[in-house]
Amino acid sequence: MRRREVALPRDWWAAGLEGSRGLWELFGRRPASLDGAVCTRLALHSPLGVRAIVLLADAPDPLPRRWRTRGHDALSLKLSIVGCSLIRLSGPMPAHGCAVDIRPQAGGVRMRLHTRDFDALITAPIRGCIAHMKAYRRADGAPLLHL
């Protein structure tokens, strides 16, 4: 039996990331939104790579049964982008996190992190990946994911 490939929206922010199909399925075959998402951690990795922790404001509706059982109502993503062609940082990364914008571009990915005093632009000609997804209770604060 052949598995039918699911066609993800080409303009969806996660389209430039490996592992986006799992996110698509988790959200009931709808694109998870980046509106209100916050990047809480950013780490540079050699050679020419970055990892970031992004907390989504959006959540699956309805919540998966396992989430409801455990009281989870939010999702944290660990993103990895390697082979970066540009990593530009300006200002200190704020302790409370910053806004995040991710877009697919020409077979790769573009990520911008920003606040009033911080700006980061990261681009790569190859796809990044969603390295890990973790459900958590928003009231308990963000989970600690190691970069």
Descriptions of predicted regions:
Residues 1-147:
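Surface-exposed, interaction-prone regions used to assemble/regulate multi-protein complexes
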